[in-house]
């Protein structure tokens, strides 16, 4: 009986040790999973930072002036993703579903918390739900204007704005398709919106926000040049004496003709259509950075501000949401992924009207 009692005690002790070991292993595995999840949770934050541009040194407190945050984002239309699935080989299908991507996009956009959000590849039937969920998440009175691509495409450009902060004075949708112009035979569009601050002391300050998504075909820079020229013609008329924030996916490298034309270098474009062309400055998102992958990590997305003395007021950039470095992009791998809902990175900038 004594031996039996010792045997039972030994069995119970062994059982307790095994349970403790299993429990410890489970806690360890759970801890590792949580740590990995935490690392993945914060990996995006480590790649992206808001960087001051130093313009506060001009004696203006950005919290007491007419400042606003703009985010521009090509969010990858689901219909286009499904049409070009071969571009996303190697990415788990769960990361490509609209439900998962929308969840990731909402999390990112709510954290960025823009006053004005410019979207490219915004699928028309997804826009109302996306905006409603943003409203529920940030409590802002969001409104929007939208322009679908010409023809049968289901995506286009949207400008979402905080209607409690801004009054929408006017907007214009521009189709970059013109039967009379040989190079303007594509379905791309642009969208303009003119805003005024609602605060009584700032009501005289107006500005224009414009967004576009130019042709993708890497061999047709001539078409993109013609599209830029048309956008500038329309912007010149629409903006009159109002400063402009121009955003979008231009599918053009920084040293390409379309971008050089925008920043006043003219490139290979005949500027006779704009006798007094608008000139812009790129809000620099950092050296050696990238916004998307096109056979290599490149920048094709931009936020720009208009320059010159034609405007009563001017836009002063206060800070920029720095893009990830090419090395970080390579390390992070393909996008969309576990945390990011698009195949582009979002751009952001804070401006003040002076």
Swiss-Prot record:
Region span, Disordered: 22-59
Keywords recorded for this protein, A-Z: Developmental protein
A biological-process GO annotation: mitochondrial mRNA 3'-end processing
UniProt GO cellular component terms: mitochondrial matrix
GO MF entries: catalytic activity; mRNA 3'-UTR binding
Matches recorded under InterPro entries: CCR4/nocturin_mRNA_transcr (IPR050410), Endo/exonu/phosph_ase_sf (IPR036691), Endo/exonuclease/phosphatase (IPR005135)
Tissue distribution of the protein: Ubiquitously expressed in embryos.
Family indicated by similarity: Belongs to the CCR4/nocturin family.
Name of the protein described by the UniProt record: Protein angel
Native organism: Drosophila melanogaster (Fruit fly)
